[in-house]
Amino acid sequence: IRNQIGEKEILAALEQVGLSGKENLKVKKYSLGMRQRLGIAQAIMEDPDLLIFDEPTNSLDKAGSQSFIDLILDLKEKGKTILLASHHIADIDGISDEIFEMEAGQIINRRKV
């Protein structure tokens, strides 16, 4: 059963991803990076214990990427488990506890950070 999400939680999630004040815009007016951040906001609204992100910084500019990294670090401090998939190890190296490298669907390297 999903939690009831109120306006307070929605506005807080939008603020966490840098979309504060944009809640009344139609989604079609959002840039690709804004849509990426909206998806991240939707993921964190229900306060799940596990978050899975696939290429989360792909459509974000440098400031948006840093904002996402800050958000991930905050979520980690709150005890959340986070799984990040990325083609760019440098993007996740500084925020990961453990990295698995895969090739052709197989784990070829595993290391703790």
What do these predicted ranges mean?
Residues 51-54:
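Catalytic Walker B motif of ABC-type/P-loop ATPase nucleotide-binding domains
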Residues 86-87:
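H-loop/switch region of ABC-family ATPase nucleotide-binding domains
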Residues 40:
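Hydrophobic anchor residue at the start of the ABC signature
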Residues 57-58:
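Short loop immediately C-terminal to the Walker-B catalytic DE motif
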Residues 62-63:
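Helix N-cap at the start of a conserved alpha-helix in ABC-type nucleotide-binding domains
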Residues 47:
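Conserved catalytic motifs of ABC-family nucleotide-binding domains
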Residues 5-22:
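Conserved ABC ATPase "signature" region
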